[in-house]
Amino acid sequence: MNNRLEETPQIDNTDIILEVHKISKRFGGIKALNNIDFSVRRGEVHALVGENGAGKSTFIKILTGAHAPSEGKIMFDGKEYSGLTPALALDAGITAIYQEFNLIPFLSVSENIYFGRELMKQGFLDYEQMNENTKKMFKEIGMAINPKIRVQRLGIAQQQLVEIVKAISKNAKLIIMDEPSAPLTEQETETLHTIVRQLKGKGITIIYISHRMEEIFEI
């Protein structure tokens, strides 16, 4: 697995939010990851570049708790983990946006963002507040999507924005983006990169996974 670090001079080098020490992962006799050391600072965009089969997906799944490492440890935001569960990762502030979005097509944008964490008022779902909060979160990244529209009516780029806002709503400290530009047009990719820079400005750490070297230098 190869990686490239984008330097962020205004952030103290000692402000490391994620450290991975000697992480290995075996599947039977196959070693998918071998003694990986990796660190990233708070509010930094860190690109991981590698071809298919390089271990990028396995690495994501370890960070998000879908796989337990065979060896090694993870330090995140000052806490040490020998392995993460999905619930622990989410509580810690780690979230991932995969190429296949985790959205429910027949629900609205705001319902997807608050799914499983719905706001209540006097025993009923508080749609008004969820819609208002959703509008504000989109505005924070310079975008506008009707929070009442069903996700199935949105294009791929808009669905990706819903995933990003969903991560923001969960107070994500680290967002892992897996080949986020793969389904996008050139203009949509430029918009995505602008949003990534905005998230960085808010102190959110981004791990940006891609196999396109030319794209990495644009972020």
What does each model-identified segment do?
Residues 2-219:
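Glycine-rich phosphate-binding loops of nucleotide-dependent enzymes
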